[in-house]
């Protein structure tokens, strides 16, 4: 058995002691486990000593090789750095986190050196920009839901599309506030049908009549607009005839596109109208090619009737039952504007014998609250009327706020008549619960956190105030520095809404994505 001679030598360069083990002879027995570990440790120490003797030359060579290597840079341990071998201990006074940060900084410096050398050889180095998961690729197109009225390229594209479909385009009216310059400005003075020849137009007369009613404000409210749209589409389907060598499921969808474009030019479509059009298009594309035309048209008209009955009429009845449970005797209920659903809820609760009082809050220029006040007075409900600047003075005596909704967005925000967010904010300051009544067919997958990106600009001339023979702001367009803003909707964050009452039940705003997911799976 060969003896293991242990020699201790002192290194003159570092003052460190290393234990060197002699290998066993060829004729000796096999080394034990302790001897193998000792030999392995000896090799590591020798390797470290050789690198320390090289000193600065080793560090420079490693930096150059790391800059030329395409893979991740590896660091050569020097006197002040820690080796990555597991058998080595962390130097005293320095933590592992500090050493990792030091190595990371050195790697970044080596990458910068590499980029600088590339720039010297072939132009400027590419600028590194932090990429996030939510950003779109640089070469990708950003699809906008609404046409940007201040983008000439998109406007030219819209004009060409309207010309192909033989649909007149609306011209902008007056000067707009710069913050909302991307939204189209609507005016009742610019008529779309002024130069339209009805007999030679591709637009169905029922759709022309509907578009004019939208633009003049004769039909307003999400439910009323959606029902009127489906009735007009039923008339279009009734008068439709499938051309030769065409299928109804394909040709009818193409026929409806210019009609929808015309309605959008008259007034932007609501979320409820988008969902109704999506439903009808799906029903049309599902028509079998072997089915007779009259039978297919009858089925499509029945589908439109079923949509109105289930999504609007029956949904309103279910909401009435849920909302009536939230109205108690002695309540003081604040409502805003005129929501047909809220009006029915209050009248139904009063007819059931509950005694309460209603405060109707209104705002210019539409003054829709007057219609709500008229409905309540006819039903015998005690009501008071005030404008929105005075709402904070009556909220201390209000027990709950009952509001309607134009749409419920996927992030839980409520899109409703402008001023709703202000009322919800003041109600939260007075600890008054805010209840929103909304059918689920108004839920949409759009996400919006403010009222600036997507909204509707109504006629600015509606802001003119008549006082006897004097009309305030009569010649506002003659002043180039004056701009009028008649915003239609605002967005209320979900934090200000306590409960949403739907036909499915009473849910929080955070449950809107769940309802959308269930609806998409059912379809």
Swiss-Prot record:
GO cellular component entries: cytoplasm; cytosol; eukaryotic translation initiation factor 2B complex
N-acetylalanine, modified sites: 2
Region described as May bind the chemical integrated stress response (ISR) inhibitor ISRIB: 170-179
Family: Belongs to the eIF-2B alpha/beta/delta subunits family.
Gene source species: Oryctolagus cuniculus
This protein's name: Translation initiation factor eIF2B subunit delta
Basic residues compositional bias, start-end: 41-51
Post-translational modification Phosphoserine, affected residues: 12, 129
Gene3D superfamilies tied to this protein: Translation initiation factor eif-2b, domain 2 (3.40.50.10470)
InterPro entries: IF-2B-related, IF_2B-like_C, NagB/RpiA_transferase-like
Control of this protein's activity: Activated by the chemical integrated stress response (ISR) inhibitor ISRIB which stimulates guanine nucleotide exchange factor activity for both phosphorylated and unphosphorylated eIF2.
Protein's UniProt keywords contain Protein biosynthesis: yes
Positions with biased composition (Basic and acidic residues): 31-40, 95-120
């Amino acid at each position: 058995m060969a003896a293991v001679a242990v020699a201790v030598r002192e290194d003159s360069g570092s003052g460190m002691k290393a234990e060197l083990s002699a290998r066993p002879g060829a004729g000796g027995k096999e080394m034990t486990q302790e001897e193998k570990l000792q030999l392995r440790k000896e090799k590591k120490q020798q390797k470290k000593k050789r690198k320390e003797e090289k000193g600065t030359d080793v560090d420079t060579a490693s930096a150059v090789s790391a800059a030329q290597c395409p893979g991740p840079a590896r660091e050569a341990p020097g006197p002040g750095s820690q080796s990555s071998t597991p058998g080595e201990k962390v130097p005293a006074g320095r933590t592992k986190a500090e050493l990792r940060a030091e190595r990371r900084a050195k790697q970044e410096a080596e990458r910068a050196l590499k980029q600088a050398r590339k720039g010297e050889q072939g132009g400027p180095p590419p600028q590194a920009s932090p990429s996030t998961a939510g950003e779109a690729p640089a070469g990708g197109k950003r699809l906008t839901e609404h046409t940007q009225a201040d983008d000439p390229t998109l406007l030219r594209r819209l004009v060409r599309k309207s010309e192909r479909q033989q649909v007149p385009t609306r011209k902008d009216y007056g000067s707009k506030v710069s913050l909302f310059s991307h939204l189209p400005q609507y005016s009742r003075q610019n008529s779309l049908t002024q130069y339209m020849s009805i007999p030679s137009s591709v637009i169905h007369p029922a759709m022309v009549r509907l578009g004019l009613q939208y633009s003049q404000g004769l039909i307003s409210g999400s439910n009323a607009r959606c029902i009127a749209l489906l009735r007009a589409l039923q008339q279009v389907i009734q008068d439709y005839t499938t051309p030769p060598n065409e299928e109804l499921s394909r040709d009818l969808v193409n026929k409806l596109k210019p009609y929808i474009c015309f309605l959008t030019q008259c007034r932007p479509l609501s979320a409820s109208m988008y969902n109704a059009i999506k439903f009808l298009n799906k029903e049309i594309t599902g028509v079998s090619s072997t089915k007779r035309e009259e039978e297919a048209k009858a089925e499509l008209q029945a589908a439109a009737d079923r949509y109105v009955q289930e999504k609007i009429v029956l949904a309103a009845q279910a909401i009435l039952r849920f909302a009536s449970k939230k109205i108690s005797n002695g309540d003081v209920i604040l409502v805003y504007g005129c929501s047909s659903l809220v009006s029915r809820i209050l009248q139904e609760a009063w007819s059931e014998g509950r005694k309460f009082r209603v405060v109707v809050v209104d705002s210019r220029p539409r003054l829709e609250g007057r219609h709500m006040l008229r409905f309540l007075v006819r039903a015998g409900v005690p009501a008071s009327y005030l404008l929105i600047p005075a709402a904070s003075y009556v909220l201390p005596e209000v027990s709950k706020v009952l509001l309607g909704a134009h749409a419920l967005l996927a992030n839980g925000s409520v899109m409703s008549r402008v001023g709703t967010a202000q009322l919800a904010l003041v109600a939260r300051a007075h600890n008054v619960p805010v209840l929103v009544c909304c059918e689920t067919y108004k839920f949409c997958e759009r996400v919006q956190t403010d009222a600036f990106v997507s909204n509707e600009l109504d006629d600015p001339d509606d802001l003119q105030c008549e006082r006897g023979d004097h009309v305030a702001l009569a010649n506002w367009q003659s002043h180039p520095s004056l701009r009028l803003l008649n915003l239609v909707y605002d967005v209320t964050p979900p934090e200000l809404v306590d409960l949403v009452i739907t036909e499915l039940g009473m849910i929080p705003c955070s449950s809107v994505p769940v309802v959308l997911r269930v609806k998409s799976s059912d379809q």
